[in-house]
């Protein structure tokens, strides 16, 4: 059972099946690495803290010890996952026809919402179903309008978010409390997660062959 005191994300492993060959450079993973380096080396990226503040130091040390213990336990339980010789990633993963990496601009201040625009175009092109998972529904008017257009196409459209009882982001949960009627007015079928922990996964399923 997940720790109820922590948020739980959705992580996906991508494996470059062409690694070590002449086609390795075509993998989308290189684009992800380039994006990371672009953000890391940007002139506006600065070190925030060299060490934990005094009033956080004890909790940071306790969490560090817990992570080390969890890692040691995991290594003992699954040694095969750390062995390059015995790990068959092709067997452990599912082949994909194509993978596209999209991201917003990294400039400071206001940014063009490129990621949302592209996701919205994909949703509006759905023919069978759209399932959107997000921790919180904090929208501006253009996003409300976009969700309404998706729902208005008549394709089953579901949105899964944290209920206000399990959401661990006070500001985001407060926004949903204030604007819940606006979210429902988009026409999407809204599912509120009432689990024992806060879900922080972000995913999008379109028809039977596209995920984001």
Locations of the language-model features?
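Charged, low-complexity intrinsically disordered terminal segments
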Residues: 1-212
């Amino acid at each position: 059972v997940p720790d109820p005191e922590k948020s739980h994300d959705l992580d996906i492993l991508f494996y470059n099946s062409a690694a070590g060959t002449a086609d390795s450079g075509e993998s989308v993973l290189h684009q992800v690495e380039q994006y990371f380096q672009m953000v890391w080396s940007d002139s506006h990226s600065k070190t925030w803290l060299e060490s934990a503040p005094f009033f956080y130091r004890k909790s940071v040390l306790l969490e560090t010890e817990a992570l080390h213990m969890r890692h040691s336990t995991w290594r003992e339980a699954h040694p095969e996952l750390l062995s390059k010789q015995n790990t068959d990633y092709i067997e452990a993963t599912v082949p994909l026809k194509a993978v596209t990496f999209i991201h917003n601009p990294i400039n400071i201040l206001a940014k063009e919402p490129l990621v949302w625009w592209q996701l919205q175009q994909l949703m509006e092109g759905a023919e069978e179903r759209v399932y959107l998972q997000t921790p919180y529904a904090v929208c501006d008017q253009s996003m409300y309008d976009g969700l309404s257009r998706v729902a208005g196409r008549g394709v089953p459209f579901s949105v899964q978010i944290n209920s206000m009882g399990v959401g661990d982001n006070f500001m985001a949960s407060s926004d949903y409390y204030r604007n819940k009627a606006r979210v429902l007015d988009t026409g999407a079928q809204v599912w509120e997660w009432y689990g024992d922990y806060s879900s922080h996964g972000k995913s999008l399923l379109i028809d039977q062959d596209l995920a984001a």
